[in-house]
Amino acid sequence: PRFVRELAMPALDSGVEQARRPDRPRIITASPLITGPDVDAVDRSRQTQRAVLAFLYSTPAYQRTLELFGWPELGPRLRTMTRNGDWASLGALMTDEVLDTVLPTGTWDQLPDILEGWYGGLVDGLLIQPPEDPSLDARFSETLRAIGSIRPRLD
């Protein structure tokens, strides 16, 4: 949510003003989540997201995000590791603090309240990735119904 508030929304507001638009564009967030039906699945998701973020944050495109959260040295360290072919060690730099700061984390039962806390009143919608296992769809649909009641952004 901090990225949306401090970087994305000011940029959108500036663009709206420059274009003399009567309203702001809709904001739909597609943030990755650390989630699953139970604690073990959340732990597995955490490890997957640790590896994904380590790779993404090794690219210069994410340097501004790292600076926003007070980790300006993290990107260059990750880039050095990728240049040296040290792919296996990237995840070690992605601490739990980093993950918990940038990604909503919790079981499916906890997720609606967590997302309300992160994004309620801030965005117009949330893009949520369904589980890979279709046998979990019915259970996940309950979570999606609850997420559907999150307060949208009000202009």
Can you name each region flagged by the protein language model?
Residues 1-155:
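Active-site-adjacent structural elements that line small-molecule/cofactor binding pockets in enzymes
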